[in-house]
Design a protein with these regions (language model features):
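Basic, short loop/linker segments at the boundary and entry of helix-turn-helix/winged-helix-like folds
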Residues: 27-66, 70
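Trp/Phe/Arg-rich N-terminal binding region typifying the photolyase-homology
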Residues: 46-58, 72-113, 120, 139
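Helix-centered, glycine/charged polyanion-binding patches within enzymatic domains
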Residues: 332-401, 405
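Electropositive, glycine- and tryptophan-enriched low-complexity nucleic-acid-binding patches
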Residues: 280-326
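Short, conserved catalytic/metal-binding motifs centered on acidic residues
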Residues: 25, 62-64, 78-82, 104-108, ...
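Active-site- or DNA-interface-adjacent structural scaffold in DNA-acting proteins
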Residues: 95-272
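Charged, often Cys/His-bearing segments associated with DNA-binding zinc-finger transcription factors
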Residues: 1-34, 41, 421-426
């Protein structure tokens, strides 16, 4: 049921939060700049009007979601810290200090699924509007500056919260699924293979030792055979409504060497994960999905979109479509690195990449191109901040939906923190 609006505030013997707190604090100023009514109007129709318990206020849930990514903490931690931090409570619309937790951590999960990708994109759009209000929209002669119509694009990998995948590790996990499913469903297995698996683990422990290649390969083949037998036996005996069926079907595909959507299975609980090789010396392979980030010359992120493992040049059109939805100014020039070669334009937007200067280019034009691509390199540290400060380095949300919303929430948190810094100059927030 939709939340009940509070029309009456009981008088208190003590001062309210607005009287207690410093209204020049960055969180206080950010709370005043955000148009919370936009979220109320967009999310209220998603609740049932006359059935069920009244829900937690929309501003509270949206504020918790923003604070989680701004402060880079988990659902459980933001709920705990909210009860201890008066500025968090004021940011979420509270008028009196509350010493209790506002909700269960699982309610944030339900709220994210309720608002969906479009709701998270609305939060990103509001973060752009908050920053766009402070930007100069014309030069001294009344013309729009190029900073509004020029953008830079780059891609990075959003790693999923999985361990490094190996066949041995995933086969053992499939066997563990089988043992747990049999215990929960009261199915008696013909053979559990527990003793044999223990011996195989001992053999596979010395995988990197000399003269052990053949015996370890033999143990791998035997483990795959055991996993296949157990999975097929359980699939035959499990009832149709068992919650274990989807997981065991994925496990059977892995045991048989099948693929999902054209790629191998690297995780049994996150089968959509793909392997991406970006040519890094530090990390040869990354397991997750590709994301596209677009920023303006002033450092404002105006586009954040999730993909699978497409070629960089094929992400331009969809990224610009998102920008047209959430950014109020048209993008006339989009600069990328050499990974975006192959596409020179998208609609009214010209796409440029670093290249050898033409013989007809004047020295002024060469200097201008050089300055543009030097400015483009500034997107790299922004991606670094998204990963280290706003939860883009490790995606804890589940499935393709989690891939999509995590990158947008990280970008929105970066923009909100940028607006907070603007209130206090270059001091640390």
């Amino acid at each position: 049921m939709k939340p009940t609006p509070s029309r009456y505030v009981a008088p208190s013997l003590f001062s309210g939060l607005e009287d207690m707190l410093d209204m020049n604090h960055p969180l206080s100023k950010l709370a005043a700049k955000i148009d919370w009514q936009t979220f109320e109007d967009a999310f209220t129709p998603l609740y049932c009007p006359d059935n069920g318990r009244p829900s937690t206020p929309i501003r509270l849930m949206a504020g918790l979601l923003i604070l989680k990514h701004v402060r880079n903490i988990s659902d459980e931690s933001i709920v705990e810290q909210w009860a201890e931090n008066a500025y968090y409570q004021y940011f979420c619309g509270m008028q009196q200090f509350c010493a209790m937790q506002p909700c269960a951590a699982s309610e944030l999960v339900h709220f994210r699924h309720r608002i969906g990708e479009s709701g998270v994109e609305l939060i990103l759009q509001e973060s752009i509007r908050v920053n766009d209000e402070d930007e100069p929209h014309h030069s001294g002669r009344g013309r729009k500056p190029e900073a509004e119509t020029t953008a830079f694009i780059d891609s990075t990998v959003q790693e999923k919260n999985i361990t490094f995948p190996t066949d041995c590790k995933l086969l053992l996990k499939a066997v563990d699924y089988c043992h747990k499913a049999a215990a929960e469903e009261n199915i008696r297995l013909r053979q559990t293979y527990r003793k044999e698996i223990k011996k195989l683990k001992r053999v596979m422990r010395f995988r990197g030792k000399a003269k052990s290649k053949k015996i370890v390969a033999k143990a791998d083949r035997r483990l795959r055979t055991i996993a296949g037998r157990l999975v097929r036996e359980l699939l035959r005996n499990l009832p149709p409504e068992s919650p274990w069926l989807p997981r065991l079907e994925i496990a059977l595909k892995f045991v048989n060497g099948e693929k999902i959507d054209g790629h191998k299975i690297y995780s049994l609980h996150e089968p959509e994960v793909v392997c991406i090789a970006k040519g890094k010396d530090r990390v040869k392979y990354e397991f997750g999905n590709k994301v596209s980030i677009v920023r303006t010359q002033s450092g404002l992120i105006i586009g954040a979109l999730s993909f699978r493992n497409e070629y960089d040049g094929h992400t331009i059109d969809r990224s610009l479509e998102q920008i047209r939805r959430i950014y109020p100014h048209p993008i006339n020039l989009l600069a990328g690195d050499r990974g975006y070669r192959g596409q020179s334009s998208s609609g009214d937007t010209k796409v440029v990449i670093p290249d050898n200067p033409q013989s007809t280019d004047s020295p002024y034009k060469k200097r201008k191109k050089h300055a543009l691509f030097r400015k483009r390199a500034g997107i790299e540290p922004i991606i670094g901040h998204l990963k280290t400060d706003h939860r883009l380095s490790r995606n804890f949300y589940k499935g393709l939906f989690g891939d999509s919303i995590n990158v947008m929430l990280s970008a929105a948190a970066f923009n909100f923190k940028r607006a907070m810094r603007a209130q206090i100059g270059r001091a640390h927030v």
